[in-house]
Amino acid sequence: MRDIMGMMGKVKEMQSKMEKVQQEIAALEIEGRAGGGLVTVILNGKGEMRGLKIDPSLFKEDEVEILEDLIVAAHKDAKEKGEAQAQEKMADLTAGLPLPPGMKLPF
């Protein structure tokens, strides 16, 4: 019976830590860049876009496709960085847990 109570206590502690880490992740601000910094996308930890910076030199009618590609690339860069930071924070939390390889938390 003590084992079950101890396990329940650990589960509650883990839930509390998980909530804290999720809040930390949500508060992250991640910048993705493309075109050598000509385009910058800013995402929060949830992957929501919070900002976009475009160098004025890209505002040329004949370079619209280039600008579109750079925006997509900068967004992808920011998203990948955010996912990596989130995985790093979660790895610290789940260290020692027998989770299957490649399993992403939170679910």
Swiss-Prot record:
Q: Where in the cell is it found?
A: Cytoplasm, Nucleoid
Which Pfam family name is an example for this entry? YbaB_DNA_bd
Protein name, entry field: Nucleoid-associated protein Atu0095
Alphabetical list of InterPro entries matching this protein: YbaB-like_sf (IPR036894), YbaB/EbfC (IPR004401)
A Gene Ontology molecular function term of the record: DNA binding
Record function comment: Binds to DNA and alters its conformation. May be involved in regulation of gene expression, nucleoid organization and DNA protection.
Instruction: Please give the start and end residues of each transmembrane region.
Output: none
- Record's compositionally biased regions (Pro residues): 98-107
Q: Which UniProt keywords apply?
A: Cytoplasm, DNA-binding
Q: Which family does it belong to?
A: Belongs to the YbaB/EbfC family.
User: Which residue intervals make up region (Disordered)?
Assistant: 81-107
What are the top taxonomic ranks of the organism? Bacteria, Pseudomonadati, Pseudomonadota, Alphaproteobacteria, Hyphomicrobiales
| Assembly | Homodimer.
HAMAP family linked to this entry:
DNA_YbaB_EbfC (MF_00274)
What Gene Ontology terms describe where this protein resides (cellular component)? bacterial nucleoid; cytosol
